[in-house]
Amino acid sequence: MTNQKKRRFLSLLLTLLTACSLIAGTPLTAAGAQISARGSGNERAIPSQDIVILYTNDVHCGIDDNIGYAGLALYKRQMKRETPYVTLVDAGDAIQGAPIGTLSDGGYLIDIMNKVGYDFAVPGNHEFDYRMPRFLELAGKLDCGYYSCNFTSLATGKPVFAPYKMFSYGDTQVAFVGICTPESFTKSSPAYFQDGAGNYLYGFCEDNTGEALYSRIQETVDAARAAGADYIIAVGHLGENGITERWSSDRVVAATSGIDALIDGHSHETVPAKMVKNKEGREILITQTGTKLENIGKMTIKTDGTIKAELVAQVPGDSPQVEYTVRKGDSLSRIAKRELGSYDRWTELYAANRSLITDPDLLRTGMKLVIPGSVLINAEGKAVDYATDAYIKGIEKQYQETLKVVLGYSDYNLTTLNPATGQRAIRNAETNLGDLTADAYRMVLGADIGLSNGGGIRADIKTGNITYNDTLAVFPYGNMGCVVEATG
């Protein structure tokens, strides 16, 4: 190796060493699927208006990716114009996966979920990546709370969170049952669920057959029915393909009865709607949206009692009204009444236009104001909710300067992919980014051999400057480096 190449190689290593130290609606399916909610042997109240359940899974901090949270907020608002019965749920892995999560230990994502207005959420395995004390703190800050029937305290044998939540839509009662994957032990880290002596404090109703999980879910479904639920919607971070089969959503449905539909997550699959027979032979709908807000899930319990599911890949823009020209005699309260329906909303107008308004009592005729809560067509041409978009941009502004710091430079793309096929290879074969991360661990820890977990390398680095943001994208997890000493 020439001296110049050695210097370049060492520069790349130092870049990752520095990072280590710093871290210590267009429907996709127009019809979807529709099933009868009758035939389970139960008399149930049919809704007087459609019940719309919007759902997300595996967002992984993708706040602006694809539809984005601001697009989701807009779509939720659009659905509320069609029916008063709208509920928004998340099936897990929302708060981890990008720098915004890493730098705030998940806090910014909880703030954004509260802004969008979630009504129900289930912990995914990556919700635990910030360790249990922080996760429980975040759970207390999430307005809707987390729900899970099988995440249990081993000391009491009881669920840590409420196992289900009942919603009333007129005379119709719908129970949402939360289910965590028992894979959380291995897909997160066993140490997160133990005390300092290595004793397990928490469990997920895991066993070698799946029966413990099925039994707990069935108990919860039966309890919700006894409490008056007309419909049971399971929200599970379970997955379908590539995960432990006995804990898959398919197996859970097949081993239980009483669930009317299952909203899934964990395996990042795009499943508009598939049908699986339950223990009684009844067809049950399973659906999943993919990842990073590629789609919004829309499930509808219709006025004839049937259940329909579809995926929305694009949010339509409806009557965007971004600017308002101040007229003679206008005041913030008068504009708020005219444009937003209430004099009291003048404070929202003021907050949205602070850069323009120096005195809320004095408005200059002809000045252009933004009406909050209106539709905005953003730079990518996507329709988003203005107020939510502004809120997210305010959060991003708080940490963007830190992320722009340049740590190094690369003449080559550093990749997790097989260059011949373009497929992700880092868990199965050698890649230059995998080699670099292993060398970085070896050097910073003073070891003879460096090992890097391929599953923990989550992004590529393009040719050119390497920023702190790049390294956090590669290493989004709060992992700790370890040294093992062994005799020869």
Please report, for each region that a protein language model flagged, where it lies by residue:
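Acidic, metal/ion-coordinating pockets
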Residues: 32-320, 426-429, 433-440, 450, ...
